[in-house]
């Protein structure tokens, strides 16, 4: 079929949420002529739900995005109103940064970045059709019948695909925040042969700040100690006049109001058909599932420095408006609250992610990539991480270069993508530290050491940043070597100083590195005894040193496990293997293999329902095929 294309691009990204922004910036920065099409230019990088970035596991993802050369970390470091390190009382594997964002400023600043980016065209357009010829993407068609050619297309439509907002008994076609839904494109994806699922998510009401009695709530301030998402941000730029959040709770009256109106709740009346998020349930769902709990936490989160809107985190609901007002006013501090926006639920179509490769390219159509909530995930950070990987791989495909696959041992982004393409998801997928078996080596403090080299090799990390990274890496390695070479002896003067600090005296000579393995001994304490490095160390290097030294034994065990799994990951499975040709594997395993088509032995081993015996048989089969080829040659 001959198309009359209005314009030609290397890559077209459909949707300008958090996934679309990262995908388009990555592709254009890698030298590809890129079009970013969105239904509404005013909603670029918009936050339709919580006004925050980061949190448990998610904060590590933002650091990973930054280390690879993505934008989210830099953007939130310019636009936050509060910064807080979570889980500081726990081990380093689960620590993560979280920022309250100035919602409007975040979107505005990201839009400016996109508008200034070379090779990137931003256009308001509804994409209705992905144009495909001979199983390959060739372009897109808009609702106004304009056609644009592309060698790769990335779909990042968020919750807009056949979106429907639900509020009480009201249900109507809409994307998030009453934007347009993308219905024709949803039909087109089905017609192209993609399996489609249906998910649901929700958002809480927003209340007017001046109507809140904060004296009845508990203040939740940010951190005084500087912290940043981007490895390029400087401590001297840390914002000190931060805006606090506030803590309050539901109570028995709140629960009574909900219970008395469950018949009007779409969650229970049968109006909601989509599957909702397990880890972010609606308040009505929480009251029913945890009926024994007398109260639930609610955080009052300002949506910006210059707005009255306050997000009531923990009160996601699709109850009717009148019930929402009564519910809000039953809560301590909100007795006179003015509701500025109602909470609502939204149902939307997703592309079932078992149809994707680890590059986020669909197996059905060459050159078609999907990312973000389109793939069944929840959260801005999960979306941005996928968008970055999809954009990178779309560009690499266009350029004829080797693809980028992040392994589970490389990044939380790799864990997420592997979970999606290997196991699929039956509900909106959220990243958790418990999903990562190698979480001790996937920490927030070492994201640059893990990923910046990759970002540099693919062209997303520039020379200036790479030089800063290499200097930090050299500082770390040199200081580690120095600490391992200096001996502390159990002489009386040394032990006296150690005891004065409240620590146990030495009984044997040990290196400064061994001394730092003691739980109470920080780098600052150790250098009191052995002196400092020749040049002052970056605070990020000091944090990395302390973690790597104190957890060295555990880290080594994790790296040994990674090495074993690497051997499995290196055993590739041919793309067009006939699974019926393999004798003796269990029926369930055969069915799963046919559905998912794993690309490596390692991926095959992680499919639920596949047991070690099936993997052993598959390994023997693959080795037999390889020997057969050698004999033929």
UniProtKB/Swiss-Prot annotation:
GO terms for biological process: tRNA methylation; tRNA wobble uridine modification. NAD(+) binds at residues 276-290. It is found in: Cytoplasm. The keyword tRNA processing applies. FAD binds at residues 15-20, 127, 182, 373. Its cofactor is FAD. Keywords: Cytoplasm, FAD, Flavoprotein, NAD, tRNA processing. GO terms for molecular function: flavin adenine dinucleotide binding. The keyword NAD applies. Pfam families: GIDA, GIDA_C_1st, SAM_GIDA_C. SUPFAM superfamilies: FAD/NAD(P)-binding domain. InterPro entries: FAD/NAD-bd_sf, GIDA_C_N, MnmG, MnmG-rel, MnmG-rel_CS, MnmG_C, MnmG_C_subdom, MnmG_C_subdom_sf. GO terms for cellular component: cytosol. Belongs to the MnmG family. Homodimer. Heterotetramer of two MnmE and two MnmG subunits. NAD-binding protein involved in the addition of a carboxymethylaminomethyl (cmnm) group at the wobble position (U34) of certain tRNAs, forming tRNA-cmnm(5)s(2)U34. This is tRNA uridine 5-carboxymethylaminomethyl modification enzyme MnmG. It comes from Streptococcus agalactiae serotype V (strain ATCC BAA-611 / 2603 V/R). The gene is mnmG.
